[in-house]
Regions:
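Membrane-proximal low-complexity regions enriched in glycine and acidic/polar residues
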Residues: 176-182, 186-266, 274
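Active-site-adjacent mobile loop/cap segments within catalytic or ligand-binding domains
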Residues: 249-306
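C-terminal single-pass membrane-anchor helix
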Residues: 305-373
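Sec-dependent N-terminal signal peptides of Gram-positive bacterial secreted proteins and lipoproteins
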Residues: 2-22, 319-336
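Non-catalytic propeptide/linker segments at domain boundaries
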Residues: 44, 55-116, 121-124
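Short, basic/aromatic beta-hairpin or loop at an interaction surface
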Residues: 23-38
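Catalytic-core regions of hydrolytic enzymes
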Residues: 126-201
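Short, well-ordered loop/turn sites that connect or cap secondary structure elements
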Residues: 47-49
Length: 373
């Protein structure tokens, strides 16, 4: 009897554990969300649960009220316009949830990145939607890293893999996230690509250039859910202002996506597997600008771009400073000696003093030696 009870208890715990991880974007299953009138709202590569929320591109909020798992369809109630991002409210939310190490107050801009689904790739660019090695998602990671670094941000990118792509992937990537958080970054990004088949849902134009939309995902089953949501809303609001059409939408799902680890943690999906990978890579430049603005302010981009120019100009600035000082010295010497001959001696003496005898004195000594010969 005791053995049976123990086996039953273990089986129940395993089932609950599996269910908890399955909440987080089950792969290879598409769910369709419709409103109460039957109009299509969105498609998700993963399960949708009652209570999940969705913020559309035009900031309309939907709350799921029922789900038919056999038909892979969810019905959502329109709730009107999602309240606009409120900076004061966000500050209060982050103040109560922030776990960032106060010791990291050195002014350094630092963002940490990783990819939970290490196989995600793009059929148009990688030749397959899933690759065990050299997955296309890491090309997107590297492109975003480079774009952020050009803005003056230090990026810690983990290339750890968390295969296979199953319900336990987030458990494996959690270890990576925890290691990255030891660095006390300003934000923690989990980079993905979507799995919906219609690439047109991600095709867009920004500033007249073709690029990919980006979907933001927030896990509502975690203590940081409010902070994660505000972070996502801030990203969308900033992107809508700077690059209208870049952010596809925000999905707030039942899982946690490891976001309980950090208030400024977000999952970003760059395009889908049927989209041209180059478009997903192009979107990283826009997202880097958005993230830099969100985390460090409007002037951060200009500062980042100006740093290289300042460094490049430093050498020429020093040269001109020396030249001006030298010219002033020559004018003064000429005025005080009255002759060009004496001026030469004056300059040689000054050069000897400035260079510790390497110039000027050495020439005079050589001339003296020749005279003695």
């Amino acid at each position: 009897m005791k053995i049976r009870l123990t086996v039953a208890l273990v089986a129940l715990l395993c089932a609950l554990s599996l269910s908890a991880r399955a909440d987080e974007l089950d792969g290879d299953v598409l769910y369709r969300m419709v409103d109460v009138s039957g109009q299509a709202v969105m498609t998700l590569d993963g399960r949708i649960y009652e209570g999940d929320e969705y913020i559309s591109a035009d900031n309309q909020l939907y709350v799921v009220i029922s789900v038919d798992d056999s038909a892979h369809q969810a019905v959502a109630m329109p709730m009107g316009t999602e309240p606009a991002y409120d900076a004061d409210k966000a500050r209060a939310v982050f103040a109560s949830a922030d776990k960032k190490d106060d010791a990291k107050d050195d002014g350094k801009k630092l963002i940490a990145m990783y990819s939970t689904h290490s196989d995600e790739s793009y059929e148009n660019g990688d030749g397959a939607a899933s690759l065990a090695k050299n997955a296309g998602i890491y090309d997107v990671d590297r492109a975003l890293k480079k774009a952020l670094e050009e803005k003056g941000v230090t990026v810690e990118l983990s290339t750890n893999t968390h295969l296979p792509h199953d319900t336990k992937a987030y458990s494996r990537s959690r270890r990576t996230a925890e290691e990255l958080l030891k660095l006390a970054p300003d934000a923690l990004l989990d980079i993905h690509r979507d799995g919906i088949p219609d690439e047109s849902e991600y095709e867009t134009e920004v500033d007249g250039e073709e690029t990919s939309k980006v979907r933001l995902l927030v896990g509502r089953s975690n203590p940081n859910a409010d902070a994660n949501r505000e972070f996502a809303k801030q990203i969308k609001a900033t992107a809508d202002e700077k690059y209208k059409g870049l952010i596809k939408d925000i999905f707030i799902g039942k899982g946690n996506y490891n976001q309980e680890l950090y208030p400024r943690s977000i999952l970003l999906e760059f395009g889908t597997h049927t989209l041209d990978k180059d478009l997903a890579i192009d979107a990283t430049g826009y997202m880097a600008d958005v993230l830099t603005t969100v985390l460090y302010g409007d002037s951060a981009s200009a500062e980042g771009e100006g740093a290289a120019k300042s460094a490049k100009g430093a050498g020429s600035g020093i040269f001109w400073a020396i030249f001006i000082v030298a010219l002033a010295g020559i004018v003064y010497a000429l005025a005080s000696t009255g002759t060009l001959k004496n001026l030469g001696a004056k300059i040689a003496g000054g050069a000897s003093e400035l260079t510790g005898g390497l110039i000027g004195k050495r020439n005079r000594d050589e001339a003296s030696e020749k005279k003695d010969e």
